[in-house]
């Protein structure tokens, strides 16, 4: 087995371990905040958005059906995590955003794990960080593409 082949196998195995650890972490964080893991992911994704988004956009971000995304937004509203307002450009559509102060609450919840992840990242050079960022962006797109393929029955 070539060194490259062994390295690729190692990366695949470490990626699987990373994903499993992230799923466990996400569940623990959701439990700590009293949320369903999907709801936590939606809150985290909304926190990354530049402004309010449609329920349809949330469906695309989360991989949920439009109906499931609407029920997710209902739960977030009921929990006081998000607000739904009429779209000023299309009154038939609503836009969803985090409630004021929610970004700070997310930041507080992420303070300890964020510090731990930050310590890991600080051990890399700028060039290595660029490579890691590129890999994560590209791997994320592969994941999204494969989820779409599987959802479409492919």
Explain the meaning of each model-derived region.
Residues 26-65:
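N-terminal helix-turn-helix DNA-binding core of bacterial DNA-binding proteins
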Residues 1-33:
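N-terminal leader segment of winged-helix/HTH proteins
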Residues 18-25, 62, 105, 109-120, ...:
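Alpha-helical linker/hinge and terminal dimerization helices associated
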């Amino acid at each position: 087995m070539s060194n490259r082949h062994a390295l690729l196998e190692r990366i695949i195995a470490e990626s699987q371990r990373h994903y499993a650890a992230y799923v466990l972490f996400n569940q623990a964080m959701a439990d700590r905040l009293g949320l369903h893991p999907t709801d936590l992911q939606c809150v985290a994704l909304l926190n990354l958005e530049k402004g309010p988004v449609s329920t349809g956009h949330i469906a695309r971000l989360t991989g949920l059906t439009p109906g499931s995304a609407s029920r997710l937004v209902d739960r977030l509203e009921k929990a006081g995590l998000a607000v739904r307002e009429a779209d000023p450009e299309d009154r038939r559509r609503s836009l969803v955003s985090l409630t004021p102060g929610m970004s700070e609450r997310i930041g507080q919840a992420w303070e300890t794990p964020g510090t731990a992840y930050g310590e890991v990242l600080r051990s890399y050079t700028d060039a290595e960080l660029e490579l890691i960022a590129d890999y994560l962006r590209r791997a994320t797109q592969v994941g999204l593409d494969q989820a779409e393929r599987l959802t479409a029955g492919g």
